[in-house]
Swiss-Prot record:
[4Fe-4S] cluster binds at C149, C152. Transmembrane segments: none annotated. This is Fe/S biogenesis protein NfuA. It comes from Aeromonas hydrophila subsp. hydrophila (strain ATCC 7966 / DSM 30187 / BCRC 13018 / CCUG 14551 / JCM 1027 / KCTC 2358 / NCIMB 9240 / NCTC 8049). It comes from the Bacteria. Pfam families: Fe-S_biosyn, NifU. GO terms for biological process: iron-sulfur cluster assembly; protein maturation. Belongs to the NfuA family.
Length: 192
């Protein structure tokens, strides 16, 4: 469910040494399955353990996950990176905003999942997002851009060279292409 790198495990062990005996870590999602989902890591003292919590054993500590957060933390990774700028703990949970869909789920659900878990996190760096409006009988995904992508001069490139290539690669033979249904209005919100 959750992968914790060796460096992150060492970091947690060091932090937990300063806590009361029996303290572990808890990984959780606030507002799971929504666009406002946020992940977090906290200390979990013994008196805060719920009988329904999942216990994931690691070297020197356990990671506890509540049953509501668990399906949204599938494929989550925690890493601890040190560089010239300092140290940083990263938690990546690609399914926090949307549960992972089955490989045999309807195409529209699988496309939506890829947009939410892979495409939108990249667009979010520019304040943008994309949503699936419809899937046509001709196997075209009709998309709508929002935020910083609306009116951006690079939107055609993003659509054809980024999103379309990625979706066609993931769904060969099931999808023929993508089209933009956005009425673009250039403004201060536009990224480029």
């Amino acid at each position: 469910m959750i992968s914790i790198s060796d460096t992150a495990q060492a970091h947690f062990r060091k932090l937990l040494e300063k806590q009361p005996d029996g303290t572990n870590i808890r990984v959780f999602v606030v507002n799971p399955g929504t666009q406002n989902a946020e992940c977090g890591v906290s200390y979990c003292p013994p008196d805060a353990v719920d009988p329904e919590d999942q216990h994931l054993p690691f070297s020197g500590f356990d990671c506890l996950v509540d049953p509501l957060s668990a399906p949204f933390l599938v494929d989550a990774t925690i890493d601890f990176v040190t560089d010239q700028m300092g140290s940083q703990l990263t938690l990546k949970a690609p399914n926090a905003k949307m549960r992972k869909v089955a490989d045999d789920a309807p195409l529209i659900d699988r496309i939506e999942y890829v947009l939410m878990s892979e495409v939108n996190p990249m667009l979010a760096g520019h304040g943008g997002k994309v949503t699936l409006v419809e899937l046509t009988e001709d196997k075209l995904a009709i998309l709508q851009f929002g935020g910083g992508c609306n009116g951006c001069s690079m939107v055609d490139y993003t659509l054809k060279e980024g999103i379309e290539k990625q979706l066609l690669e993931k769904f060969p033979g099931e999808l023929n292409g993508v089209k933009d249904a956005t009425e673009h209005q250039r403004g201060d919100h536009s990224y480029y």
